């Protein structure tokens, strides 16, 4: 069409006063074109005006327009014999000065005047049309009247208005121009409806325009029969939309049409969008509708000025194409009916079986009974419809509209008059009872007109009605009637499609006119215009796939082409103004002929599947550039005339690069390739002295390409062509060397100063292949790409206004509620907003004060009370805050979602809790479930999308995408999980939607019900009546009623219908007497016996549960039936214990306010509550066990003679094994050997084997905690006989989540310490797989001889005694506690030592500061070890242990080899420590010249031999008291720290097992949580500081009191298992694990005390194990706090936070989610038995460390000083170095020592000066310098006092490693201080 219409060369708009574009020389300008006051254009240009020829005699009438055009302009007045459809629209008159009322012009003897042509003066005419631009006449004023008879003559060689006079009303002509019948077959006419390439002359278009003009004037023209005037205008509109804007001037009537749209735009521009939308939906004026579209789109494009709602409205309006086709609906219905009939009859493969199924589904008998019992009353209709809905399972669907339908429909049917029925009957009978069909009745014409209006949207004109009449009149028979109906259907479809195409054309015109830089001036407007054009293009494209639109495809393709031009233009404009991703450029340099160009194309193929674009710099224009992903520039530096350096710099840049192009359509083309490959023959493309050398070499990678085969051939065969064998297809013939950064040659890189470029040698090149080079380029481009664009609507904002002192409380409460309900809102303190409004984000909630100027929905907080977690239900946060919020506001605040987000990557931490789970079998299942998420409009859009997919399956993807973009989601919060065959989809919606899609099966059960959600209904109690508006009370009442009705509506309607039905057959008896209006009394309740009542009361009292009687009976019934859920197992345990202690209860009378009562009082003490493993049930299948089965190295398979597996046996040491009796029945074989000496104890079997496993397990009789796979097990540990498939077995019943199978019998159950206490003997099978039968271990004396040569001091036959709660046993080897101290007062401070904050620890009974004896102090320190701390529950601890192990696997090697001999392991130990309870003195005292003495060697050999068998060693320690400085307050109460001296044999075995693991952990302290091994006086502190500065995270510094004594044994056991995970799991490792997990024994003064809990400070690897314990307990506390708050932890918690742990010192860096529950975390730690405190040991609450305050860790304060990041030692720790000296042992510490080691003392104080220098010059000079000068003088030291700057420089040298650290400063780096024990607190 564009080619055809481009033939039109006449430019329209003579009314604008412009000279026509082209006139023939022999045709002067007609006189009627001259205005009443001459408009002399030519005279202005220096030419004489040309007058018209005298032959022009006919009077030209004004251009008529359709009747719906009502122009509103007031500047130009048209008059004459206007058609009747021209209605006046304005009475405004433009007057520009006194002018004559009329003027005349003589033209060849013919007088032309206003009167001659029947033109009315402006002040009389009301028909105002299109305005003209103002022009200046001779007097400079606008003429008052315009005599314009025909404004179109200047546009054509032969004016269509003039030629229309020779056209008769019937379309015939006088022969000068073709008739209408001939016009319809010309290319001019056909080109308007097709894309033909035939030539169309201007005369043909003129003739067509003449007929269209006549059709507008005369209704009898044949064009009006075939087309309405609206259609005729539509033809021109289609042409206008398809032609480029620059060529639209060539179209007829274009300027008038444009002026009409402009006028309409001015009239409606300021109207609201709703009014403009009415114009789009109701107006039949296409000019008005096109103007409306332009207004809507213009406001959308300028959304920055008119608001984002204008853009959203326009985007939605563009998609609402009214394509509803009644004809297609009828056809789809008929086709569906036929398909169903065919499926039931013809295509059904099993008709015999299908018909019975169909009969069963129809339920004909019941249906017949329902129909027979139907009554024609309202009640009858209700009963019948409800029965039908109940019969076919549609009660819930029909329940909401059945009552309305019954009432209104029944009344409507009853009120229908019989007269109307008889009239309709007579018409039908008159038509169909005759011998032939009679459609001449006007009734059928009315029906046809109504159908036409319903289908096309327009009332048909006379021509269309004539077609209807002709079609219906010819229907004289059945066949003719069918044909007539088909003809009408086809005609209706065509008219409907024409209207759709016209509508699309109007939108396209509006968009193309907006593609103007004067309108879209900024980049935001360009972006909006492009998006709208893309939306409209997708809509047009979707219609091209409609088979019924095939005739209009050429027009639709032209519309798409016009929109593509708009999109491409916007893309170019954006590209010029938008930052782009810099491409990756590489230069291949090398000699000619080596294969660079071929390698470049091969590299391009590896980078992209597209063919590369080619650019040559030898030409100055780049029209041939195609913009593909890879661009190749061959020999880019070959021309000296080209500034190729600047070209490359501009090309490899983030700023857009506009290419120089010659073609107009390529103007503005930018460079868009991702990768640039250039070749060059020069080693240095740009000289290093060039000003652009730095920018050039920084942007490119240079690869030197060499071909050794080619070089050798050329040197050996000069002048000969290189053969092909020098090249290989895999490019192995090339050697690629990648240079470093900024290399201008192979040897040198650029000098940044630019002075001497040969001063910096280049690093050696990297040898690389083409594949590696391609991968490197891809990675580099991915790194460069880092920008994303999101779009969504406005996000709601809420504010809670409170007092300043209440902000933290309100914030914490809202944070807790957010975590409890999985809310989506963003929470802030104050007005500052930190979260980005990306798609999927939630509402913004601010906690603000009354002074803040808040814009949003604000709620005043009347009171603030922080609720506990169990009370966070319903509207608790509203009650706690005293705010009045509607449920709608609560839902919006909690779950609002911005926009639509589709996530392909599923993160379990982001998934919401399900409310509905739907299994998708058909598309109807999904559609039915989606209705919950949608509004009514959204449901209609869903139906429409499904309908389109059914009609056009090819458009499914486009339709679904459009539906997702345009659908309206409900304002309610709904979460649905769709389980489909191909995967799982989770959809969450509330205003917007978030969707997660995965190909895996993901079952997430359970969600927050409406009653338990954050809404829960408003509770008005306590809010005060004045704070609650009446509207809110009424709304809440109606909401409550609706909730109640939604719960009971189904049952209510069914029961009501049943009541109506029963009332039919029930005689009604009138009640009489007193019983009238009364009924029998109904007693409801449960009767209990006295014993049951007592049990119920006792259960409520002991368990503190609010149980009703009904709940109690149901719970008791479930427990009696053997249910294995949590409550039933607990009740069963409680009830059995109650039966055992029944006689410990006594009935006591109690007198109180309520009078005399009797209660059961328990006489015996209540046993402490054990670990409850049911409080936190979890899906243990989600994570694997660390090492499979527990103690797997000591487990061996039991097989039958034929090799069939039967069960397992466990080695308990020295060749003794345990298993089960039914496992050993028959000919059992273990390790190919028969068991010997079998001893049976119940079901347990103990036996011997000659084959001894290298590992053995410890055994005991405690209660099991874990099953064989490490999962928690629940059991009451009560034994009885159970009937099994193998006979009666004596054991206990337990519950575990592990699935067992045949052959698992004999696997071990263990307690907290990993001790085997029972064996697996059976399960509940498929009916109850969680039930397990456990056979307990029974000790059997197998006379196992102890192999240890040194008898343990605790293995004596002396009785056990109790001393102050400690269980002890005499050892017979008394060891006294060392008395006295080595700490003395310095001679410099004999008089003022009391000023020091620390003193030597208490010396015992003779010490006046504290008279407590050393034995008393020792016993007091052992008291906390008598009870084990509870620690976390086993289930949570197991999960966290697996998380920590998984986290550590990232930086700790998996397998560490065990040391093979004891001597090597011994040399791994610190030889300055004691040897333990068996041998005295230090380890180094037993080593001379590298040889161990006999006592030590014998002890190590005996221990090592036992450890090689995997047996546990005696876990014993020598106890002592630490000689150290202590704070005065602790000295006064006798507090000293214990020293646990571990047995040297145990230390050696543990070093062999775990030393290498601990070294790996210490070496990677910068990557992990454990900071053991860190140097706090080195660069490692900077790494800590960087980790502390993690954005949007809170920092907590925590210390703990009595850390060692509060360590739970099961946590220590888990830490040891983690260490074992990273070993080779040898017998030595098993022995070390079993030893360290056993209870420690401390020995002093000849007494051995066995402790129950805690972790000895001298335990091997104590720092590592303490740190692991720290991580495990913090992780368990965090997991428990989150899950108590409603956040299900399904991810590795250690991936979400950072920790610094060194024993009891900890720093926690946590995100906001965890920070919100940190108070609960610390509460959980206290429940575990720990005592967390602040680092200053105060009792204040532990709060986050502000960002501007330093963090304390390891008694250091980490700060940034002018010298860098430093860890400052406490000032008091430095100062007390000067007060005390370590020397000989004494009991009079106030007397200075007799001899001072001056070198060591001088080094100590020198180090103190270095540390003090980091605190600043003032502290150093005023406090430290006087102290050290005094010490030098009075202590006789020989050192020079360093000045401040010297001390700073020395410490910096040690810190940075430029100078070696002295021994003492290196020792202090572990956090203990400069001189070991002196600095310890």
Curated annotation (Swiss-Prot):
Q: What are the coiled-coil residue ranges?
A: none
Q: Region labeled Disordered — which residues?
A: 1-93
Pfam assignment, any one: VPg
Catalytic center at which residues? Answer: 1222 (for 3clpro activity), 1243 (for 3clpro activity), 1305 (for 3clpro activity)
Tell whether Lyase is among the UniProt keywords: no
Q: Which SMART domains match?
A: AAA
User: Which of UniProt's keywords are assigned here?
Assistant: ATP-binding, Covalent protein-RNA linkage, Host endoplasmic reticulum, Host membrane, Hydrolase, Membrane, Nucleotide-binding, Nucleotidyltransferase, Phosphoprotein, Protease, RNA-directed RNA polymerase, Thiol protease, Transferase, Viral RNA replication
O-(5'-phospho-RNA)-tyrosine: modified positions: 1093
Entry's InterPro entries? AAA+_ATPase, ARM-type_fold, DNA/RNA_pol_sf, Helic/Pol/Pept_Calicivir-typ, Helicase_SF3_ssDNA/RNA_vir, Helicase_SF3_ssRNA_vir, P-loop_NTPase, Peptidase_C24
Q: Residue ranges under compositional bias (Basic and acidic residues)? A: 37-50
- Site feature (Cleavage) residues: 148-149, 435-436, 791-792, 1070-1071, 1183-1184
Residues recorded as binding ATP, renumbered to this chain, are: 590-597
Molecular functions per Gene Ontology? ATP binding; ATP hydrolysis activity; cysteine-type endopeptidase activity; RNA binding; RNA helicase activity; RNA-directed RNA polymerase activity
Task: Name the domain of life.
Answer: Viruses
User: In its UniProt record, which GO terms are filed under biological process?
Assistant: DNA-templated transcription; proteolysis; viral RNA genome replication
A GO cellular component entry from the record: host cell endoplasmic reticulum membrane
Which protein, by its recorded name, is this?
Genome polyprotein
Q: What is the lineage of its organism?
A: Viruses, Riboviria, Orthornavirae, Pisuviricota, Pisoniviricetes
């Amino acid at each position: 069409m564009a080619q055809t219409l481009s033939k039109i060369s006449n430019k329209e708009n003579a009314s604008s006063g412009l000279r026509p574009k082209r006139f023939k020389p022999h045709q002067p300008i007609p006189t009627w074109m001259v205005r009443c006051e001459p408009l002399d254009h030519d005279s202005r240009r220096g030419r004489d005006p040309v007058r018209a020829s005298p032959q022009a005699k006919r009077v030209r009438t004004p251009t008529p327009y359709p009747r719906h055009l009502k122009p509103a302009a007031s500047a130009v007045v048209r008059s004459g014999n206007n058609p009747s459809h021209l209605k006046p629209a304005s009475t405004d008159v433009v007057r520009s000065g006194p002018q004559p009322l009329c003027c005349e012009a003589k033209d060849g003897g013919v007088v032309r005047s206003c009167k001659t042509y029947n033109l009315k003066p402006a002040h009389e005419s009301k028909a105002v049309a299109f305005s003209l631009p103002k022009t200046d006449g001779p007097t400079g004023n606008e003429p008052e009247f315009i005599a314009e008879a025909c404004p179109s003559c200047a546009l054509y060689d032969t004016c269509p208005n003039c030629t229309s006079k020779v056209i008769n009303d019937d379309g015939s002509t006088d022969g000068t121009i073709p008739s209408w019948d001939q016009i319809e077959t010309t290319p001019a006419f056909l080109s308007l409806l097709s894309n033909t390439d035939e030539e169309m002359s201007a005369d043909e278009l003129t003739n067509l325009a003449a007929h269209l003009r006549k059709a507008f004037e005369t209704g009898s023209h044949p064009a009006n029969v075939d087309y309405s005037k609206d259609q005729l205008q539509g033809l021109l509109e289609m042409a206008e939309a398809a032609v480029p804007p620059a060529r639209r001037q060539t179209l007829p009537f274009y300027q008038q049409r444009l002026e009409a749209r402009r006028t309409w735009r001015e009239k409606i521009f300021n109207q609201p969008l709703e009014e403009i939308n009415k114009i789009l939906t109701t107006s039949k004026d296409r000019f008005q509708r096109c103007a409306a579209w332009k207004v809507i789109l213009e406001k959308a494009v300028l959304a920055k000025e008119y608001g984002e709602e204008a853009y959203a409205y326009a985007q939605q309006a563009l998609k609402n194409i009214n394509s509803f086709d009644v004809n297609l609906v009828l056809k789809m219905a008929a086709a569906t009916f036929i398909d169903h009939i065919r499926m039931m009859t013809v295509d059904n493969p099993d008709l015999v079986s299908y018909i019975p199924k169909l009969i069963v589904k129809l339920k004909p008998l019941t249906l017949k009974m329902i129909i027979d019992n139907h009554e024609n009353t309202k009640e009858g209709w209700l009963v019948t419809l409800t029965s039908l809905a109940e019969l076919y399972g549609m009660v819930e669907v029909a329940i909401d509209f059945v009552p309305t339908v019954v009432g209104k429909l029944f009344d409507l049917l009853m009120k229908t008059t019989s007269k109307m029925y008889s009239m309709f009957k007579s018409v039908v009978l008159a038509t169909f009872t005759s011998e032939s069909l009679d459609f001449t009745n006007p009734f059928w014409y009315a029906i046809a007109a109504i159908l036409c209006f319903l289908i096309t949207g327009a009332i048909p004109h006379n021509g269309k009605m004539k077609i209807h009449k002709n079609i219906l009149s010819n229907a004289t028979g059945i066949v003719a009637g069918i044909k007539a109906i088909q003809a009408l259907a086809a005609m209706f479809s065509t008219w409907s499609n024409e209207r759709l195409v016209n509508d699309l054309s109007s939108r396209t015109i509006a968009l193309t006119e907006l593609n103007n830089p004067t309108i879209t001036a900024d980049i935001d407007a360009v972006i909006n215009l492009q998006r709208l054009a893309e939306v409209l293009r997708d809509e047009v494209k979707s219609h091209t796939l409609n088979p019924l639109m095939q005739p209009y495809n050429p027009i639709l393709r032209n519309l798409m082409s016009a929109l593509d031009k708009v999109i491409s233009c916007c893309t170019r404009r954006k590209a010029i103004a938008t930052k782009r991703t810099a491409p990756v450029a590489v230069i291949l340099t090398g000699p000619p002929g080596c294969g660079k160009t071929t390698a470049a194309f091969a590299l391009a193929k590896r980078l992209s599947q597209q063919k590369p674009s080619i650019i040559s710099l030898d030409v100055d224009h780049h029209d041939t550039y195609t913009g593909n992903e890879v661009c190749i520039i061959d020999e880019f530096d070959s021309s000296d005339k080209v500034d190729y350096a600047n070209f490359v710099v501009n090309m490899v840049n983030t700023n857009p690069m506009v290419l120089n192009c010659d073609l107009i359509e390529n103007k503005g083309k930018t460079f868009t390739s991702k990768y640039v490959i250039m070749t060059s023959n020069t080693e240095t493309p740009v000289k290093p002295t060039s000003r652009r050398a730095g920018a050039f070499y920084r942007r490119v990678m240079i690869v030197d390409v060499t071909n050794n085969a080619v070089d050798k051939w050329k040197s050996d065969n000069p002048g000969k062509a290189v053969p092909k064998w020098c090249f290989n297809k895999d490019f192995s013939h090339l050697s690629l060397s990648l240079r470093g950064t900024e290399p201008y040659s192979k040897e040198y890189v650029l000098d940044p100063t630019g002075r001497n470029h040969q001063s910096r040698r280049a690093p050696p090149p990297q040898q690389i292949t083409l594949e590696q080079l391609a991968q490197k380029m891809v990675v580099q481009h991915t790194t460069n790409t880092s920008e994303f664009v999101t779009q969504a609507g406005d996000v709601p904002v809420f504010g809670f206004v409170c007092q300043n002192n209440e902000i933290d409380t309100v914030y914490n409460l809202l944070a807790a509620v957010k975590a409890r309900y999985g809310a989506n809102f963003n929470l802030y303190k104050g007005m500052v907003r930190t979260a980005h409004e990306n798609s999927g984000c939630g509402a913004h909630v601010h906690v603000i004060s009354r002074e803040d100027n808040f814009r949003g929905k604000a709620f005043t907080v009347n009171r603030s009370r922080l609720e506990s977690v169990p009370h966070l239900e319903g509207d608790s946060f509203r009650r706690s805050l005293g705010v009045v919020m509607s449920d709608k506001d609560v839902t919006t605040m909690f779950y609002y979602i911005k926009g639509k987000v589709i996530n392909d990557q599923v993160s379990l931490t982001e998934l919401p809790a399900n409310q509905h789970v739907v299994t998708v079998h058909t598309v109807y299942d999904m559609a039915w479930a989606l209705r919950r998420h949608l509004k009514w409009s959204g449901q209609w859009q869903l139906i429409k999308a499904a309908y389109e997919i059914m009609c056009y399956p090819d458009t499914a993807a486009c339709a679904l995408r459009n539906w997702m973009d345009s659908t309206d989601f409900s304002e309610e919060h709904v979460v649905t999980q769709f389980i489909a065959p191909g995967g799982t989809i989770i959809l969450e919606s509330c205003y917007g939607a978030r969707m997660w899609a995965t190909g895996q099966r993901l079952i997430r059960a359970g969600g927050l019900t409406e009653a338990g959600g954050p809404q829960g209904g408003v509770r008005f109690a306590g809010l005060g009546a004045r704070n609650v508006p009446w509207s809110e009370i009424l709304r809440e009442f109606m909401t409550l009623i609706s909730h109640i009705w939604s719960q009971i509506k189904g049952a209510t309607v069914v029961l009501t219908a049943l009541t109506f039905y029963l009332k039919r057959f029930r005689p009604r008896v009138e009640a009489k007497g007193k019983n009238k209006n009364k009924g029998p009394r109904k007693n409801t309740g449960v009767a209990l016996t006295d014993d049951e009542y007592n049990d119920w009361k006792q259960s409520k009292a002991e368990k503190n549960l609010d149980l009703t009687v009904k709940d109690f009976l149901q719970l008791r019934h479930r427990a009696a039936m053997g249910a294995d859920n949590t409550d039933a197992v607990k009740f069963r345990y409680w009830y059995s214990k109650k039966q055992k202690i029944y006689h410990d209860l006594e009935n006591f009378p109690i007198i109180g306010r309520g009078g005399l009562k009797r209660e059961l009082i328990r006489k015996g003490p209540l046993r402490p509550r054990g670990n409850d493993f049911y409080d936190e049930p979890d899906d243990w299948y989600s994570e694997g066990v660390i090492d499979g089965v527990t103690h797997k190295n000591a487990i061996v398979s039991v097989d039958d003679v034929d090799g069939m597996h039967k069960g397992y046996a466990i080695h308990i040491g020295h060749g003794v094994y345990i298993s089960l009796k039914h496992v050993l029945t028959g000919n059992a074989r273990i390790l190919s050997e028969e068991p010997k000496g079998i001893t049976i104890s119940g079901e347990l079997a103990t036996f011997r084997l000659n084959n001894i496993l290298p590992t053995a397990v410890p055994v005991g009789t405690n209660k099991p905690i874990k099953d064989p796979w490490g999962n928690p097990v629940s059991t009451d540990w009560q034994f009885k006989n159970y009937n099994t498939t193998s006979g009666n077995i004596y054991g206990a019943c337990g519950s575990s989540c592990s699935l067992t199978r045949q052959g698992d019998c004999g696997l071990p159950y263990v307690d907290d310490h990993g001790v085997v206490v029972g064996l697996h003997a059976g399960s509940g099978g498929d009916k109850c797989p969680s039930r397990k039968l456990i056979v307990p271990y029974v000790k059997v004396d197998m006379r196992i001889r102890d192999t240890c040569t040194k008898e343990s001091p605790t293995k004596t036959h002396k009785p056990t005694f109790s001393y102050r709660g400690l269980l002890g046993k005499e050892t017979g080897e008394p060891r006294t506690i060392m008395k006295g101290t080595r700490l003395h007062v310095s001679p410099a401070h004999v008089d003022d030592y009391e000023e020091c904050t620390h003193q030597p620890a208490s010396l015992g009974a003779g010490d006046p500061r504290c008279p407590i004896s050393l034995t008393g102090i020792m016993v007091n320190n052992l008291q906390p070890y008598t009870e084990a701390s509870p620690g976390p529950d086993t289930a949570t601890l197991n999960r966290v242990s697996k998380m920590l192990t998984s986290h550590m696997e990232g930086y700790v090697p998996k397998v560490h080899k065990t040391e093979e001999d004891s001597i090597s392991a011994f040399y791994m130990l610190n030889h300055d420590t004691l040897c333990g309870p068996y041998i005295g003195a230090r380890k180094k005292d037993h080593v001379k010249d590298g040889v161990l003495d006999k006592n030590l060697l014998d002890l190590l050999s005996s221990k090592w031999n036992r450890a090689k068998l995997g047996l546990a060693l005696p876990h014993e320690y020598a106890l002592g008291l630490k000689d150290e400085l202590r704070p005065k307050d602790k000295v006064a109460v006798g507090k000293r720290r214990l020293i646990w001296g571990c047995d040297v044999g145990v230390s050696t075995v543990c070093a062999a097992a775990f030393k290498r693991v601990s070294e790996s952990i210490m070496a990677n302290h910068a990557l992990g949580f454990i900071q053991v091994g860190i140097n706090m006086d080195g660069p490692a502190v900077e790494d800590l500081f960087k980790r502390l500065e993690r954005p949007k995270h809170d920092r907590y510094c925590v210390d703990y009191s009595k850390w060692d004594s509060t360590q739970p044994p099961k946590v220590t056991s888990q830490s040891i298992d983690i260490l074992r995970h990273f070993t080779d799991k040898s017998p030595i490792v098993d022995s070390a694990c079993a030893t360290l997990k056993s209870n420690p024994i401390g020995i002093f003064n000849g007494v051995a005390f066995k402790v129950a809990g805690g972790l000895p400070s001298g335990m091997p690897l104590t720092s590592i194990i303490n740190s692991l314990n720290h991580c495990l307990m913090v992780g368990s506390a965090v997991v428990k706090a989150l899950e108590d708050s409603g956040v299900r932890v399904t991810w590795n918690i250690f991936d979400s936070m950072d920790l610094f742990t060194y024993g009891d010192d900890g720093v926690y860096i946590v995100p906001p989610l965890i920070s919100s529950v940190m108070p609960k975390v610390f509460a959980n730690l206290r429940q575990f038995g720990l005592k967390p405190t602040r680092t200053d040991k105060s009792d204040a609450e532990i709060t986050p460390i502000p960002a501007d305050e330093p963090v304390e860790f390891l008694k250091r304060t980490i700060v940034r000083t002018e010298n860098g990041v430093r860890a400052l030692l406490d000032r008091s720790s430095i100062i007390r170095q000067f007060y005390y000296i370590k020397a000989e042992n004494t009991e009079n510490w106030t007397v200075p020592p007799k001899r001072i080691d001056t070198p060591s003392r001088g080094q100590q104080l020198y180090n103190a000066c270095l540390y003090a220098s980091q605190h600043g010059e003032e502290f150093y000079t005023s406090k430290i310098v006087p102290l050290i000068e005094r010490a030098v003088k009075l202590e006789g030291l020989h050192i020079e006092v360093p000045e401040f700057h010297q001390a700073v420089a020395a410490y910096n040298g040690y810190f940075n490693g430029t100078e070696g650290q002295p021994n003492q400063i290196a020792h202090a780096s572990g956090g203990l201080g400069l001189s070991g024990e002196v600095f310890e607190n």
